[in-house]
Amino acid sequence: MNSYAILLSLFFSFERLLTLANANSLYSPFNNSSFVDSDTSFSDLSRNGLLSLLDSNTTSASVQTIAISQTDNAASCIPSASLLSSSVVLYSAKETVTVSSYWSLVSTSVTGTVYVPYTSSVACFPYATSDAPNPIPRGDSATSTSIAPTYSASDSSATTITSSSPSTSIIGTGSTDTSVSSTLTYHTPIASPTTSSNSDNEYTVDVITSSSLSSFVITNVDSTTTSVINYIGASTLESSSLTNTVSPTESTFYETKSSTSSVPTQTIDSSSFTSSTPVSLTSSSTSSSGSSQDSTTIDSTPSTIATSTLQPTTSSPITTSAPSLSSALPTTYPSSLSTEVEVEYFTKTITDTSSIVTYSTGVETLYETETITSSEISSIIYNFSTPISGSSFPDGFKPINPTSFPSLTSSTKKIPSTTLPTSSKMITTTTPSVSNNTQSSFLIISTFTSSYEHSEPFKVSSVPLTSNNFSSISHSSASSLPITPSSYLSNTTLHSSVQSSQSSQFTVSVPSSTQSYSTSSNFTTPITISTSLSSFPTTIVSSSFQYSSLSSNVTTTNAQSSSLSSSNSSALTHISSSIVSSGSSSALSSSTIVSSINSSSSVFISSVSSSLQYSSSYVTETTTSGSVGFTTTIATPVGSTAGTVVVDIPTPSWVTETVTSGSVGFTTTIATPVGSTAGTVLVDIPTPSWVTETVTSGSVEFTTTIATPVGTTAGTVVVDIPTPSWVTETVTSGSVGFTTTIATPIGTTAGTVLVDIPTPSWVTETVTSGSVGFTTTIATPVGTTAGTVLIDVPTPTASSSPFPSCNTQCTNENSFRIQVINDDIYPSYVHLDSNNYAIAAARGDSDGENVFIYDSDIKRIVSCCGVKPIYRLDQDDTEGYSFEIYKDNDGQLQFKYPLNDALYPMELLTLTDGRIGITTNLTLYKPYYLNNVENERAANVVLRALEY
């Protein structure tokens, strides 16, 4: 054996020192205690200057863990209430896993099958609150490229849904108010027209609705003019007084709360809106000579809200077909579009309500005179059947003008004080006496209300009253509120609604003498509705209502009981409508001349309401067998019942997917139209037999429970097991038997899979001399006692090999023994003791391993069983843990360690107990080992490898 091999052996022993120091009670040069006690850390060793290295020979079991993870994509998501999910675990994937264990020379391999739970992704939307509204509508998956939106809170009463797609966003509002929580409205303004020739006259309108407050935003296209109208709930309005008068550009709305439902067989053509105006009177007493003044405020806010509701009617549905597209159209257009739209003009009502206030001694009584004039316009049918291409209307795209003009009816009645309608009330209050020099005042409220409804993406434009030339009248300024951005939803047909109103309030001061004041104004209020048919160019449908000769006359007299009266006249002189396509300079229009409507009263209250509504029907999407149906709830006109978008599921059979024998059936629950029972999508499982998978002897059966149509009992999928015997696997002598419990059809007792173990003898495995016998307990059929597997270990025979039984790498060509040169004992050879320390002794072939090899990769000596010897270190070997061993050509082993990028030789010695020590300076050993335990035996020893 040469010195190089000896050096390697010492190196391995050195590494083992760190771990085994506790067991060997190594002594520190500073005290007589253990060199490394159980609480000494590596840093403690460094401080003491005592280092050792360890390369453990302990064989540890290798454990292979197979993790099957299932992504829970609904953990932070609240799915739609109508979207049901099955709690049944489906198994759709499997993999074969082989687990092996090593023990001495006996290897056992067991192969099993792992069934991975099937995970289906359920699309859902998280909500900011737990009581979220109805499901959010989504676009057609075949044409929409938007991704699932996420939520971010914008304020306390609204929730904004945003998407990473720049062209898609949704603004919707919900409420935690249980009375209106089922209402959710989406607004989808279209993109700006391609031409801006008429943009100066356009205004965009957004409505953001909640249970208690909404904002109606009117914005000029060029962003030069902005008006915001508050939406005030009834409870808020009732507490208001004259001191909080509404500004001329603001409107007062009354909120109508209604539940949401759906009637699949009926088209909803209705609007439910409320129009009412508070009557407020103010009387004040002043003195021109500087005496004190008195003021009285009378608030006649209605206690009950008047409601006008149009009943649902049946109209033609919106259908979809598939004509071919023109090659000139952009690729972003839908593949087809053919839409027939029925536009119905509902009753236009002009109501003039007059009130006469009579001052008597201490009592004021309010009477109202109601004049009602109504007009009706018949339906207009527009047929959009051909895509728009270019700057003109193609054939089939021309609208049809109204078939008749409105017919007018008028009636006037005096409302007695005892039979006032629920929308108003008689006011009786005590007022001070009015002297001759009293200056009285009253309030004129003018309200204009419009309501629009249709089922296409739209933009509503409205211009407030443009002229109010009243003499001696003060106007309050408009409020400035934040502007709410527009919203857009691509490729989705919505049923949307906008309700607008402008209100002007004027206070006229009348001197004590008898005088008359007349006020008048001419104004035109155009209402423009811009629609976009899917991805086609912008189409503008506009209607305007023109009024003229709006006047008021106020007269007072000098009397103890003064009478205050006013007269006014208003005329709805013109109603016009037009349809203009973007890029076209021409417009198709119709106009109607309306006769003047006049009335006289002391307090003038004027309101005009109009309704433009596209007939609503279900939007359907036809699916084929194997597809999944779904239903999306969409917003409908304000005040009406919410409708739904229904996917047409083939009738009367289930939507099915045919599977072959051996496949697994599954059922998915889908949402159905609101109000009906949820249906399911059923995988067609062959009937009448079970879905089976034929197995051969030795296979494992399994059963999977699947969902069945709603209302029936869940079924199972059964693997066909050969009958009547057990499913068995034939093994030969030496194999291991096992039993696996499997699921059986629901209601039966679980069965087992039995490995056929030969009887009556043990299952044995023949091993060679040197192996270790062991017994393993295995499972037996259910109800029997567990048995064992016995390994037959032959009686060991004597071996003439120089290598130990654990040898894994030594051969006659690469192994050597290590001789210790200059030791006080001669001859001296290296062997490993029970703690793997390198020991120099005369009998190098006993008490442990004594044959080594040199590992050139790690530059270390290792034993035939892979153990690195441990060497005793001195205090100053701070780099000793990284030393290397080099074997010279003559076999001498050179110990070196790196320091400052250089290799320094290490010197050796032997201790009294024969352990080999390593140091960089032998003189340092003297003070440390001169004790009764670890005295040095010889210094400057050399290790040399002796080849066989």
Swiss-Prot record:
Residue span of region 5 X 36 AA approximate tandem repeats: 617-796
Subcellular location: Cell surface
An individual GO BP term: flocculation
Sequence repeat positions: 617-652, 653-688, 689-724, 725-760, 761-796
Signal peptide: 1-23
Sugar-modified residues: N31, N32, N57, N383, N436, N469, N491, N522, N553, N568, N598, N921
Region (Disordered): 136-174, 253-333, 408-432
Keyword Repeat recorded: yes
Domain of life according to the entry: Eukaryota
Record's keyword terms, sorted: Conjugation, Glycoprotein, Repeat, Signal
One annotated Gene Ontology cellular component of this protein: external side of fungal-type cell wall
Polar residues composition bias: residue spans: 253-264
Assigned protein family: Belongs to the mam3/map4 family.
PANTHER family: M CELL-TYPE AGGLUTINATION PROTEIN MAM3-RELATED
Function: P cell-type specific protein which involved in agglutination during conjugation.
Name recorded for this polypeptide: P cell-type agglutination protein map4
The species this protein was found in: Schizosaccharomyces pombe (strain 972 / ATCC 24843) (Fission yeast)
Lineage, broadest ranks: Eukaryota, Fungi, Dikarya, Ascomycota, Taphrinomycotina
Gene: map4
